């Protein structure tokens, strides 16, 4: 998935403290903002995606799962989405309770399953190697084309902040 590529490049393919801008509306990338100098811009809303604690967002995403990626919440069986079975509802109250205490043992295995599937730090090593190998082969493009691209696509926020990247 593209998530694995972007995640690997942010986590392993950049210099320490290098400012990195992810241009995507995909909220799966919010977790990458745990890393210093990582920012996200949504071309759909034409706004920076910030103001959400990336640690809290990741934990809730792990608990709730991601139906669009076929990942059920931690209360539901592995195959419920594939088999079209309704998931057991994951309430805000329960998420809050589990923030303040540990995940009950009976849900621990599913929590670990979802962590592996949702947390981009768990992208399989062999995929990370392939991603980085391919990335290093590609020539680095010129930043000189960015202002014209941003202007053409009405990306005013990015145009104003281009000096940051």
Indicate residue ranges for each PLM-predicted region:
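Extended two-metal-dependent nuclease catalytic cores across DNA- and RNA-processing enzymes
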Residues: 1-160
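Short, amphipathic C-terminal "tail helix"
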Residues: 163-165
